[in-house]
């Protein structure tokens, strides 16, 4: 099980926006950061996208929901949209 931890200082949304060079349409990327325990000595800091209007996850411990994983075009397991489940 991959454990994700969000600290109080990470309960915020970072937004980046611009205009797509290909389509000319405006876009906004909403991200939150957290730490994930990959089994090493220290957890790794990572960013994950939030949906438009989605509130940031509160501080706490989580695990990746199984729906976060998908099979890509090459038949390999990959992480898609990150969905977190609270660990109690």
Swiss-Prot record:
Gene: V
One biological process term in Gene Ontology: DNA replication
One Pfam family matching this protein: Phage_DNA_bind
SUPFAM superfamilies for the chain: Nucleic acid-binding proteins (SSF50249)
Signal sequence, renumbered to the chain: none
Domain of life: Viruses
Assembly behavior: Homodimer.
Functional summary from the UniProt entry: Binds to DNA in a highly cooperative manner without pronounced sequence specificity. During synthesis of the single-stranded (progeny) viral DNA, prevents the conversion into the double-stranded replicative form. G5P is displaced by the capsid protein G8P during phage assembly on the inner bacterial membrane.
Swiss-Prot/TrEMBL keywords: DNA replication, DNA-binding
Family designation: Belongs to the inovirus G5P protein family.
GO molecular function: single-stranded DNA binding
Name this protein carries in UniProt: DNA-Binding protein G5P
Matching InterPro entries: NA-bd_OB-fold, Phage_M13_G5P_DNA-bd
């Amino acid at each position: 099980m991959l454990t994700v931890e969000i600290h109080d200082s990470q309960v915020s949304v970072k937004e980046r926006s611009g205009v797509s060079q290909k389509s000319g349409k405006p876009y906004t990327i909403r991200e939150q950061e957290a730490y994930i325990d990959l089994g090493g000595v220290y957890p790794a800091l990572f960013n994950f996208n939030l949906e438009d209007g989605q509130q940031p996850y509160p501080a706490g411990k989580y695990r990746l929901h199984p729906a976060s994983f998908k099979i890509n075009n090459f038949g390999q397991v990959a992480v898609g949209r990150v969905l977190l489940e609270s660990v109690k």
